[in-house]
């Protein structure tokens, strides 16, 4: 007869499997057609958030946590971008991590991004020019605490953030129910050091938020 520990192990496995199935079903519902009802969309966000925590446990066991996190970000983005927001540009806030800045740069940009000299050694200059061209607010932040302060100070109607999987997910959850779209940074030199971003993809996201062609 199986021991109590064995029964407990199987119960945990079944719960995780059920959570994974429910998460997958919710994702299918989202991709099939995002509901127009605001409360129903918010309910989907809540369901995804709760189920993601459980499914991430499965990801850790299968060494697939990063892939699951990327899929979660993709679903959240889909919920936001499926229907154009057409927001006034100044009501959209672009947040970028400090690790995008060239590590040898002497200019402090976390308090004022206009200190960027646009030398081309990192993507901050391009992002600054893009935000100015579109009329979007732009800030570079060293961490989640300052990011929340910037959001509270700017009071945007929507946020576009560039970061790694962990920071994107925590940030997108922190600002909920504010619409937030996440774009993963590139890490050719490893995490948190001279990272990069796909400017073309960022342009498309920002343009979609304000209802303009990229």
Regions found by a protein language model. Name each.
Residues 113-117, 171-188:
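A short, gly/pro- and small-residue-rich
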